[in-house]
Amino acid sequence: YVKEKCKTLEIDDTTLNVSYRNPQQICDLANQLYPDMTPCQSKGIPGNSQHIGVYLVKSNDVETYLKAYNPVQLRDSVRKAVNPEYSVMNYGNSKGLTMEHVLIYPTKPIMSWLKDRSKALEGQSRAKLYVAITRARVSVAFIDDSKRGCKIPDIPVWVPSE
């Protein structure tokens, strides 16, 4: 639309394609949300954490994960139950903020997209997920509340250490 209506306007798609916040694993996942855009490359250095990247956390391991990494819990709506003893906010309210670790309570459309990224996530769900994913400086984790556990391509299941 913008290119059509403003014929003399040039769109800069190179200046903002570097992230100083996120490690490459997080950039790679975020890039898949907008495949027609120039991919973002990481220049971020997450520090000396051993827990860098993107993970899947089984719902019965959430308490252990919260204790281990103290992530900010990100959810789509205040109606989603979370552990009130840890920081929590809605996806949209996190925009512009940086957090070490985030734990995302995914909606059904988000979980479906994670399992099969060949179909675009629609509208606000895509924008909100992009914001949620890109808040993390070190790690992003998604809660898997399925009974049998799901397998998601290129996202390992986090296993608590004994």
Predicted segments, located by residue:
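Conserved helicase motor core of SF1/SF2 NTP-dependent helicases
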Residues: Y1-A68, V72-V131, R135-E162
